[in-house]
């Protein structure tokens, strides 16, 4: 057994999972958690893995990517998924938990492991030696300053401003056209043209749609030069037509005329299966958001794989900074995990902690860190956050659009998703003993 100790900073979902995975591999862990010595604006207890928003870990079925990632984690002995299964409450096809029982169970499993030493103190600098940083979206100001210093100001962010992303297969290609503004460069955008009547209908729905209430500590984010589309719209109809929906230079090749307004979609992944809606960062609730977006010509039946969000979220530019092992490129023994890496969601955060923990343990034991292939859900997330376009990087949930394409094209969505799941689980079984 190695005498080296791994520092894990943060006992949220990712940090708790990472600590457990390291400890069960015979490596000593120092798990640092500043609560209750210093609380965050969102937490209320001193328990590990406290769920601060919903009590749902989302879909549990294998026809959904987050269901697949859960099953992969079960096979890899995830402490988070084990605790969730033990504390589950009725939720249809989803996995929801009694949040207090869940946090208590995770705390018990991790804290009581003989290889884990818990340190209730705030870390304000990045430690020497093997370390996993899993401090989450509300990282303390002092540590944030050190991380900003480490990564560089251009690669460290304090809030999400993510536009919605849709599956290409769900776009009505008969209503859109491929073109770049003024035909500059290659035709890179799918354009959804609107008549004045269609724009008016869209505009009225947008300004009437219900938004997510801002938390006190989020109120400054809209003044950082990234305005929600509904806030722009509230300043008058023409704000959008002269802003993100401006039609100039985007003549419709079918009519030869310039539409009244245009919504542009930009390819979001290397495989070309996902498109984001340019300039549509939003604070709308998800139900109204879907209704508004489906008023856009060509998106009437759009499958939204990530909804637009704007909220406080400390994260790094992982494509520039991390390897798919969750290692920092400039320092082999420094790992990042959780929402800080750009994975979005409870389960995805825990999954990143699982892989970072395994790799930290392997590193101190003299073994090569593992890269999970992108045919798996966990591997596809690691691949996305480290290989996607760094310039437009924003956090992402697990979805089948991130998986490596199937060898054989399957038209029916349910059958296609089943094939993704079967391939992922067959592959992950080769890694259960790492």
From Swiss-Prot:
One Pfam assignment: GIDA
Record flagged with keyword Cytoplasm: yes
Gene3D superfamilies, per the entry: FAD/NAD(P)-binding domain (3.50.50.60)
Sample GO molecular function, one term: flavin adenine dinucleotide binding
Subcellular localization: Cytoplasm
EC number: 2.1.1.74
The entry's keywords: Cytoplasm, FAD, Flavoprotein, Methyltransferase, NAD, NADP, Transferase, tRNA processing
Protein's name according to its UniProt entry: Methylenetetrahydrofolate--tRNA-(uracil-5-)-methyltransferase TrmFO
Annotated source species: Bacillus cereus (strain B4264)
């Amino acid at each position: 057994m190695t005498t080296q100790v791994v520092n894990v900073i943060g006992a949220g979902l990712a940090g708790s999972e990472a600590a457990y995975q390291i400890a069960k591999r015979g490596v000593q862990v120092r798990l640092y958690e500043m609560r209750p010595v210093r609380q965050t604006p969102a937490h209320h207890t001193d328990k590990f893995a406290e769920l601060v928003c919903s009590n749902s870990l989302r879909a549990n079925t294998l026809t959904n990517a987050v269901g697949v990632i859960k099953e992969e984690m079960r096979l890899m002995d995830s402490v988070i998924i084990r605790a969730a299964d033990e504390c589950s409450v009725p939720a249809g096809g989803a996995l929801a938990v009694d949040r207090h029982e869940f946090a208590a169970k995770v705390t018990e499993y991790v804290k009581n492991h003989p290889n884990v030493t818990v340190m209730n103190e705030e870390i304000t600098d990045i430690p020497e030696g093997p370390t996993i940083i899993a401090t989450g979206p509300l990282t303390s100001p002092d540590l944030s300053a050190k991380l900003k210093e480490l990564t560089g100001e251009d690669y460290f962010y304090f809030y999400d401003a993510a536009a919605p992303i849709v599956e290409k297969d769900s776009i009505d290609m008969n209503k859109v056209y491929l073109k770049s503004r003024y035909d500059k460069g290659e035709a890179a955008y799918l354009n959804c043209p609107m008549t004045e009547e269609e724009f008016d209908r869209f505009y009225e729905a947008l300004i009437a749609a219900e938004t997510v209430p801002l938390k006190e500590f989020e109120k400054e984010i809209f003044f950082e030069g990234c305005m929600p589309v509904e806030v722009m719209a509230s300043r008058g109809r023409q704000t959008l037509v002269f802003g993100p929906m401006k039609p100039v230079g985007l003549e419709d090749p079918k009519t030869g005329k310039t539409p009244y307004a245009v919504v542009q979609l930009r390819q979001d992944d290397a495989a070309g299966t996902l498109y984001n809606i340019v300039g549509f960062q939003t604070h709308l609730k998800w139900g109204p958001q879907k209704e508004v977006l489906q008023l856009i010509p060509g998106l009437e039946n759009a499958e939204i794989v990530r909804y637009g969000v704007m909220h406080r979220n400390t994260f790094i530019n992982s494509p520039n900074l991390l390897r798919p092992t969750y290692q920092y490129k400039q320092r082999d023994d420094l790992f990042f995990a959780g929402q800080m890496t750009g994975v979005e969601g409870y389960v995805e955060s825990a999954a990143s902690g699982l892989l970072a923990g395994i790799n930290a343990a392997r590193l101190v034991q003299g073994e090569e860190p593992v890269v999970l292939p992108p045919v798996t859900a966990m591997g596809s997330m690691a691949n996305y956050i480290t290989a996607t376009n760094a310039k437009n990087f924003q956090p992402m949930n697990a979805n089948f659009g991130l998986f490596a394409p199937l060898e054989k094209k399957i038209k029916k969505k349910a059958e296609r998703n089943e094939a993704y799941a079967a391939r992922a689980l067959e592959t992950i079984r080769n890694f259960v003993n790492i």
